[in-house]
Amino acid sequence: MSVRQHWRVIAAAAVTLAVVTGCGSDGGDSAAKSGDAATRVFAADNGDITIPVAPQRVVATGYAVPVLIEADAALVGISSWKRGLALMTEQDRATYERLPKVAGEAAAETNYEAVAAAKPDLIVIGVPKPALGSIDMKRLESIAPVVAIGPTTPAAWRELSRRQSDAAGRGTNFQAAKEAYEKRAAELKDKYGAALTGLKFGHVGSYGEIAKGTFHREFAGSWGTNIAQDAGVTYYGEVKEKGGGGLDVTEYPAIEELPTSLGEADAITYTVQPDGTPAEAVKQVLDSALWKNLPAVKAGRVFGLQYTEAATYESALRTLDSVDKAFAPLLAR
């Protein structure tokens, strides 16, 4: 039985239990009975919000979109999420295409009339706190309870997705996906443990700017690194100056700084696109003479990783599969 099939077997029972008991989340949220619907108080980025225990009509935006699609939440509307389409399974992509779009890619592109027409009993906003300023929160709150649960640092997607799933009444589904991911990560850690022992890794991400002559250096806890870390990879170093959020774990040095930035690396991973090819910003690094002279490159310890922007446990399984495929040559050494 697949993780998704398992979810469907237990989802109805879990929701029924939640309504009967009016239980709070594992975060200690309180619960109460209001009219015919059980409610609880949920701690969100925008404060303590009273929400249904078992939401029946959910609108999701931003990072909450893939999370709640995977969790089989009772979605009636979502924002556009084109950046994550390549990470979706065929089943999730079909769900994404079927659902009404009530907002664009940016928070400012919220269609309030479309949100109201969806008649939600819960709205889950999955955008960073600074982006909330682009949303008319009072207008949304006049439609349904609104919980803002947005990203902070790249590796925080684990807790972010847990909270979003919890708000939508799908905590059990989330747990099943989490356990499947952790099992796979443990398998890879065991499989490659000996080969990875003692190796210091660096990572090149895909957001360098060719026009400015910079490359994207990612450290532990960044998009390109955090999932590989769960498989046993150790990334060394840190940013010169923390800038908050993702800038705490990533920086953009000039390409001339490649020897300084990655010269101590025993091995290097780099982000590739879903089709396995590097984006232009990565290709400019790989084509550089400075890159070719790095010790890790000369030693043949460079590995392209797909799906490094995964922000859900289900999609991160694809990242782990890519890690497994990329590291296979290490076992032949």
Predicted ranges, named:
Residues 195, 225, 245-275:
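Ligand-binding pocket segment of bilobal, Venus flytrap-like solute-binding proteins
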Residues 2-66, 172-207, 272-281, 298, ...:
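Bacterial Sec-exported substrate-binding components of ABC uptake systems
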Residues 215-251:
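Alpha-helical, coiled-coil/dimerization segments enriched in small aliphatic residues
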Residues 61-114, 118, 122, 126-129:
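A short, structured surface patch at a secondary-structure boundary
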Residues 116-125, 145, 258, 263-268:
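Proline-aspartate-enriched helix->loop->beta-strand connector
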Residues 44-46, 102-112, 243-255:
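Short helix-initiation/N-cap motifs at beta->coil->alpha
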Residues 135-172, 279-301:
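Charged, glycine-enriched surface loops/patches
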Residues 261-333:
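Structured C-terminal subdomain patch of bacterial secreted/periplasmic proteins
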